[in-house]
Amino acid sequence: MENMEKVVYLDNAATTPCAPEALELMVKALSGACGNPSSHYSVGYEAKEFVDTGRAQVAKAINASPAEIFFTGCGSEADNWAVKGTAFTKARQNKKHLITSAFEHHAIMHSMASLERLGFEVTYIKPTSEGYIRPEDVEAAIRPDTALVSIMMANNEIGTIQPIKEIAEVAHKHGVWMHTDAVQAVGAIPVDVKELGVDMLSMSAHKFNGPKGMGALYCRKGIWPQNLIDGGSQEARHRAGTENVAGIAGMGKALEMATEHLEERMAHEKELRDYVIDRILKNIPEARLNGGLEHRLPGNANISFPGLEGETILLDLDMHGICASTGSACNSDSLDPSHVLLSIGVPEEIGHGSMRFTFGPQNTMEEAKYLCDVLEEVIPRRRAMSCMWLQGQNTARHFSLKGEN
């Protein structure tokens, strides 16, 4: 087996390569529109046109009004704004209880923890073993003082897609605002805010081939979480700070392109994902898929290899030119087991050997086959040197022999 000459990038859930068309537009905005979009003269108007066009493109992609799109510095800021802004707004009505899931992105988890330190109460809904949040569990947790339900649309580690429409209906039945972190969903699957019925939705440009450091929060008309950043009158006085003109232009263009070709992109990524899952589960003993397959992002494969540490596999893959992940890139410096996998009941020792492979439109079947070739060589070789694996095999053999006597 020979190494591929190019890098095989299979970590598209962490970030995606910037689309050339988006980059070209960003360079044009940086080099040509030198004015402040709030200024009332020609070069300011040129900059504002980039902002207005980007806002319209983002709004169209999720079936919203441009006036409902508020640009942020990233998806994490959008999440913080939705959660903390709602909490501070509703606290004035003596509503200080929030509901989320136990396997959210850390932008939500840490925002909730921050609010708990301020005296708010948070209920964490446990997902099923396949990685889904049940609407009936959300409804059972709602109280008279509940301010917000925040459930992610698609999990960033295992890719499971949640029944957001049904959860939003439950929340609204009780007069509770509904937010969804759709950072992994927007640009990857169809997202229609009117169909979903959510009040707020977070997104991030670099997840759909746009620039890093650029996000947005959709707020349904009439929904105003308290500002987190005060200052100027930008973003309809809801998020101060001079707009990132080039970032907004690139975000709008990238999302427009992603949604224009969404069906074929989804089919392509699903083909690669299913090939890898089927082959690995068939050819590598005890490999297991984490999360259900039926409602799952088309490009996500999260697989555990018992008896090994994910970091070891990661290094081997890197030596073969393959970029993958042991979980969320936002928590990649930690050796603790994934809170996502623990929440769905994956044992800690198995969770440590989990790998996330996420495909994008630029990936090929040749790359998917190469990944499997490498894993089929690396996993048995590493297991042969793994005390954890050998001990487990000897224990299993011991009990098997006892059963034969």
Regions found by a protein language model. Name each.
Residues M1-N405:
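Pyridoxal 5′-phosphate
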